[in-house]
């Protein structure tokens, strides 16, 4: 096991990489489609229909490239989450296992964003061009994206963000407190095993609610939606636990403070 002084910088480096990747992901999924990062070539008349696009190599080639990037990300994200791989990385990296997973996920996502191929001449599922839709639809999408990202950041902070990023494991190890998940209740551990992506609805809003849903954006939204759907396995027991925790937190928030009590 590496000395504690080496564990802390490694965990912090992984967190900084993940944070920077998250900022870049906001730009990739929200700012670029909403604020017009990629100029279109020739307008809607230059776009092809869906049947013609399936026979055009200039569209199929970048589409296949983008598909490969997404499969690379999904494969890394799923493979490193497998129990055997987690056991192997825990054996050789110890408390840095989660930090390693986060860093590799951030690097895979960086590859997707950096080498993504837009398809400006491909067919679109919908496009807001005529007034008043050309003004109000982008504005509505922008508002929904802002709300979704605020909810995502809020949920991550509440959902033990330090443990998800691997910081808490190193912190507890340095202080000799053991594994942070070992201190959680069995019901909480069961929930975490079923729901390691606690921002599904908000992320789906970001992926699908855009003024123009082109070919490459449709591929991105569809595959990530499919992956998020398959990654969740909530049942009635999990929902009852979530409901009980929400009621407990609301009860604590509704209790008067000591200074306000009569």
Curated annotation (Swiss-Prot):
Nuclear membrane side: 1-4, 81-97, 165-191, 235-262
This protein's UniProt keywords: Membrane, Nucleus, Transmembrane, Transmembrane helix
Presence of the UniProt keyword Transmembrane in the record: yes
Residues passing through the membrane, by range: 5-28, 59-80, 98-114, 134-164, 192-210, 217-234
Membrane topology: Multi-pass membrane protein
InterPro entries noted in UniProt: Nurim-like (IPR033580)
CC terms in the record's Gene Ontology section: membrane; nuclear envelope; nuclear inner membrane; nuclear membrane
UniProt-annotated location(s): Nucleus inner membrane
Topological domain spans for side Perinuclear space: 29-58, 115-133, 211-216
Superkingdom in the source lineage: Eukaryota
Family: Belongs to the nurim family.
Name of this protein: Nurim
Protein's organism: Homo sapiens (Human)
Gene: NRM
